[in-house]
Regions:
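Beta-propeller domain segments
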Residues: 97, 116, 142-144, 166-167, ...
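Conserved blade-ending motifs and adjacent loop-strand segments that build the rim/top face
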Residues: 480-500
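Asp-box/WD-like beta-propeller blade repeats and closely related beta-sheet repeat scaffolds
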Residues: 174-200, 204-229
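Extracytoplasmic
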Residues: 544-551, 582-586, 594-598, 603-605, ...
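A short helix->beta-strand "capping" segment at the edge of beta-propeller domains
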Residues: 75-94, 205-208
Length: 855
């Protein structure tokens, strides 16, 4: 992810968060069942919605790794106990939507946003409801992004939202080439507004005060940013993305200055522009009337020609998540980077991402420099010739799309840049940094769940694609002292914040593409010094339908960390109750009900879980029949699609309401590229895939249908999706493996191979449809003994589809192609296995990449 979202940014770029360890590559994600809002056809409200369920987590070792070999060892853990549990406050798309951002209120309730414009509020016990909804423009990554709580909320009840108002923007994609008049209809804004949150937890839409509009080039991807935070002085900080398309720059910097090109392909107009608010972190002081003042000490003083005084820091690509340390004023920023698989002296460095530590206003380099001030090359997209490398100490913006200063402030190096396994404590996989909060221990706070004193002053970093949270300790000048694991169980970290109780609140995106799913969640990680609560798990065999609706409920999966026997009670939301573990209940009247399971241990501790039931309207069933899940394709293909939809209340389906979107998948995030309406048709994919050809890219087709409601109940949406696999891919982008390692090879495409191969080692990829594949050609090298490469389906010992002999090529950097003819492939979706055979005790051979030939 990168995601702008972590669905969306690209390097590791997300919404999802762009769309990001070693066995979590995006293309190997199981599609699973269809779902409401994004996965294979699950009926309406997918999965159990846990509320107040807790999970005991192992304590990480104190002072684990040292990032700086010369740094002092980490201090020993303080006396405070470390025994964490993870409490599930909300789970599943109905309770999270497409999770984007969170903010914790003084009473421990949590506001969290969904990109479709919905704002939800979840109380400390895990009860979730809709607080309000904004109308939003939602092409590509746009929609509702960040939420922030005014420092004076207890008195004024002000909250802040960053969103894309609909305006009169045309539907569909903006043109990539044309004239200014062609591009102008897609000029829009992303808006920072202040609202009042009513005492009952509902949003007062009429109270909106428009604070700040940030320009936006609509109809074409990517990078919105949109995080909100405050410093101790009450100044508001807002992060903004570069609003630039990375897909036609070969994975390097997008600085296309051609006159007929949509300006979205030139990040010099935004991140490198001192007179533009994009690609920045902005700092303002919001006044009571909704106007704002400029605090002293921003990057450019008010009145400075060709500058915007709101800019605190510039030169960011997509600073999707950041936080302000309230005690020091230091900003910790996760900034996404581009995707080049290897450095090119004619273009610039390989893709990398970074955590930035912003101690004062400055320029952080993009689009001229990245990482540890690694400079890009001034490339002419018209002539395809390279000039000189940019000067990071004195960058100049000479783009015709620049409206600001030519001479820019010097670029600041990243605090922690990383790519691949360059920071051992970060592991491997895609790169998608999420800037989290800094913890400050309060000895006077009477809270049994607050984090230990040993964590005081530590920065909590998230990684969307690698699925971890790390605690980073540093000294006063930022030198990293240690990097420690934070125990949590979840999928893709979207946002984090410490609450007034000293517990860590985490928003989990889930694993779908641009939509919530059954894994999307809101968690509270507590230091469980007073003992552990039960984990309640509620489930239902159906979650929508006509009255009378008979539902079988289940408490299966409910547990207690201490092994105690649990008792159960159910409240079905319509006045009915039960003390059975797995009751059956019939809903007789139309309505939307919340059925809540409470599990209690002998000490009286409880955990709750809930599931929503809609009576009166049945969720539509959506089946994406074409393309098949795992179907082979090549970027540039026109891919046919076919969708089948049924809905009891709608009856005859209006195919104009069926929407099919092509998403460019990269690692574990994606970017919506284009869409079409209809039950059948064809979508033209981009010729280059939009990334470096050596990147881990693939396609995702998403089909959705929203019904017309029924029985007085809300309309329901169901999605189904298929992954389509490129015929050519790098071997190192495997999903799972046995025995092998990823090896750096200068002559390899993308700079890496699958190496250290011994007899019976293997790598796997999923999903794949291989029924029309006739050959697999692999690029290999060997200074070992060579051997045989087998192509199998289903398992390492599954059906043998073909094999190729791998000769000794004369060196690990001497590559040649070998080809296996394929036959007898199973029909439908399977898992592809490359199994390695050979004699001897040393490494046999390396595999660089492979390409399928199809009928």
């Amino acid at each position: 992810m990168h995601a702008n979202d972590p669905t969306s940014t690209d390097r590791t770029d997300s919404h999802r968060a762009d769309s990001h360890g070693s066995d979590s590559h995006g293309s190997d994600r199981h599609r699973g069942r269809p779902k409401i809002r994004f996965r294979k056809a699950v009926a309406l409200l997918t999965g159990a919605l846990l509320a107040g369920a807790s999970l005991t987590l192992a304590t990480p070792p104190a002072g684990a790794a040292t990032a700086d070999p010369g740094a002092a060892p980490a201090a020993p853990a303080a006396s405070a106990a470390e025994d964490f549990q993870q409490v599930t406050l909300a789970k599943g798309e109905p309770e999270t939507g497409e999770p984007m951002s969170l903010a914790v209120l003084p009473d421990r309730s949590v506001l969290h946003t969904s990109r479709d414009g919905e704002l939800r509020i979840t109380d400390s016990a895990g009860n979730t409801r809709l607080a309000g909804k904004l109308d939003v423009y939602s092409h590509d990554e746009e929609g509702l992004q960040g939420v922030g709580i005014d420092p004076g909320f207890a008195d004024n009840r002000f909250i802040y939202l960053y969103y894309a108002p609909p305006l009169d923007t045309p539907a569909g994609d903006a043109p990539e080439t044309g004239t200014a008049a062609d591009f102008a209809p897609f000029d829009g804004v992303n808006r920072l507004s202040r609202f009042v949150l009513n005492a009952d937890g509902t949003l007062d839409n009429a109270s909106e005060k428009k604070i700040l509009d940030v320009p936006a080039t609509r109809g074409i991807c990517c990078h919105v940013g949109g995080d909100i935070d405050f410093d101790a002085a009450g100044n508001l900080y807002l992060s903004t993305g570069d609003d630039s398309n990375p897909f036609q720059s070969d994975g390097y910097t997008p600085i296309d200055e051609r006159a007929n090109r949509n300006p979205v392909f030139d990040a010099q107009r935004t991140s490198g522009n001192t007179n533009d608010l994009r690609g920045k972190i902005l700092r303002v002081k919001v006044n009571a009337d909704g106007s704002y003042a400029i605090p002293d000490g921003n990057l450019f003083a008010p009145g400075t020609d060709k500058t915007r005084p709101e800019i605190y820091a510039m030169g960011f690509r997509n600073p999707f998540r950041f936080s302000v340390d309230k005690e020091t004023g230091i900003l910790y920023v996760g900034d996404y980077g581009p995707d080049a698989g290897a450095a090119d002296p004619a273009r610039g460095p390989a893709g990398q991402v970074e955590f930035a530590r912003v101690t004062e206003p400055g320029n952080f380099g993009w689009p001229y420099c990245t990482g540890d001030n690694d400079a890009y090359v001034d490339y002419d997209f018209a002539t395809k010739t390279s000039g000189a490398a940019f000067d990071c100490a004195a960058p100049k913006n000479t783009s015709p799309n620049n409206t600001g200063l030519t001479d820019l402030p010097p670029a600041q190096a990243a605090w922690i840049p990383y790519d691949g396994a360059s920071v051992p404590e970060f592991g491997t996989g895609s790169e998608s940094p999420m800037g989290g909060p800094v913890y400050h221990f309060d000895p006077s706070l009477d809270s049994p769940v607050k984090f230990p004193e040993a964590y005081d002053g530590d920065f909590f970093a998230g990684e969307f694609g690698r699925r971890w949270i790390k605690r980073i300790s540093s000294d006063g000048d930022g030198t990293v002292q240690s990097i420690n694991d934070v125990p949590w169980t979840g999928t893709q970290v979207m946002d984090m914040a410490f609450g007034p109780d000293g517990a860590l609140y985490v928003l989990d995106y889930g694993v779908s593409w641009f939509g919530g799913d059954e894994n999307s969640a809101l968690y509270r990680i507590e230091n469980a010094t007073d003992g552990h609560s039960p984990v309640a798990q509620a489930a239902a065999d159906k979650q929508s339908g006509q009255a009378p609706l008979k539902v079988k409920f289940s408490s299966a999966g409910s547990t207690d960390a201490d092994g105690d026997t649990l008792t159960y009670s159910w409240d079905f939301g319509d006045g009915g109750t039960s003390t059975s573990a797995n009751p059956t209940h019939t809903y007789k009247a139309n309505g939307t009900y919340t059925a809540t399971l409470t599990a209690k241990d002998p000490d009286g501790r409880t955990g709750s879980s809930s599931v929503q039931i809609v009576v009166g309207n049945t969720a539509p069933k959506v089946t994406l029949q074409l393309p098949e899940d795992g179907q082979l394709f090549a970027f540039g293909d026109a891919v046919p699609f076919k969708v089948r939809v049924t809905d009891p209340e709608d009856g005859t389906i209006d195919c104009a309401k069926v929407k099919v979107t092509f998403v460019l998948g990269h690692d574990s995030h994606g970017h919506p590229v284009t869409s079409a309406n209809g039950c059948s048709g064809t979508i033209q994919t981009s010729a280059d895939g939009g990334h470096d050809e050596d990147a881990n890219i693939f396609g995702v087709f998403d089909a959705e249908y929203t019904d017309g409601g029924g029985g007085g109940q809300q309309a329901l949406t169901t999605h189904d999706q298929s992954v389509v696999q490129p015929k050519h891919r790098q071997a190192e982008h495997f999903g799972k493996s046995q025995g092998v390692t990823i090896t750096e090879r200068a002559g390899a495409h993308g700079g890496k191979t699958v190496g250290d191969i011994n007899n019976r080692d293997w790598i796997s990829f999923e999903p794949y449809v291989l029924s029309n594949a006739t050959k697999l050609t692999a690029r290999v090298s060997s200074a070992g003994t060579g051997g045989k490469l087998e192509v199998r389906a289903g398992s390492p010992t599954g059906r043998l589809l073909g094999s190729a002999t791998v000769p000794v090529t004369g060196g690990w950097e001497t590559f040649q192609d070998v080809t296996a003819s394929l036959s007898k492939a199973p029909r439908g979706t399977t898992t592809l296995y490359l199994v390695f055979k050979g004699r001897g005790t040393g490494a046999l051979y390396d595999v660089d990449d492979f390409t399928f030939t199809t009928r």
